[in-house]
A protein has these predicted regions:
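Short, extreme N-terminal leader segments that mark the start of a protein/domain
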Residues: 1-33, 39
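Vicinal oxygen chelate
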Residues: 4-13, 44-49, 54, 67-116
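Short acidic, gly/pro-rich beta-turn/loop elements at beta-sheet edges
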Residues: 20, 56, 65, 92-94
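Conserved short beta-strand elements that form part of the metal-binding/catalytic scaffold
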Residues: 29-71, 115-116
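Beta-hairpin (beta-strand-turn-beta-strand) motif
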Residues: 58, 85-87, 108
Length: 116
């Protein structure tokens, strides 16, 4: 069902400080810096051979900002999401739904490695 870990999401209070710290830890520059304006978040992405790490901070109002702020309030900076890849989205959706997980209808997309 799950074929890969697409990426990890780490909630951070200060995106600039976190970027500098993770730059030192990973020994590389980020490949992307941006915003999800509708979600109220800013992000920085570090790319690896088979996955990527997304630093995510609140910078406005929205569902993403609420997630980040809630996670930081509860646990401090840290892991808030593991995004999985699958070779069969319909099968994965059906299996997760069968086991009682609340899941949205699948939205196929092309990931950073050019796969769908």
């Amino acid at each position: 069902m799950i074929s890969s870990i697409d990426h990890l999401i780490i909630a951070v209070k200060d995106i600039n400080e976190a970027e500098e710290n993770y730059r030192k830890i990973f020994g590389m520059e980020p490949v992307w810096k941006g915003e999800h304006k509708a979600l109220g978040t800013a992000n920085v992405i570090f790319n690896f051979k088979n996955t990527y790490c997304e630093l995510l901070s609140a910078n406005g109002d929205g569902l993403g900002a609420a997630l980040v702020n809630g996670a930081i309030e509860e646990q401090g900076d840290g892991l808030v999401g593991v995004v999985y890849g699958t070779n069969n989205i319909e099968e994965s959706f059906s299996t997760l739904k069968k086991f009682g997980y609340l899941v949205k209808e699948p939205i196929p997309r092309v990931v950073c490695r050019g796969e769908q």
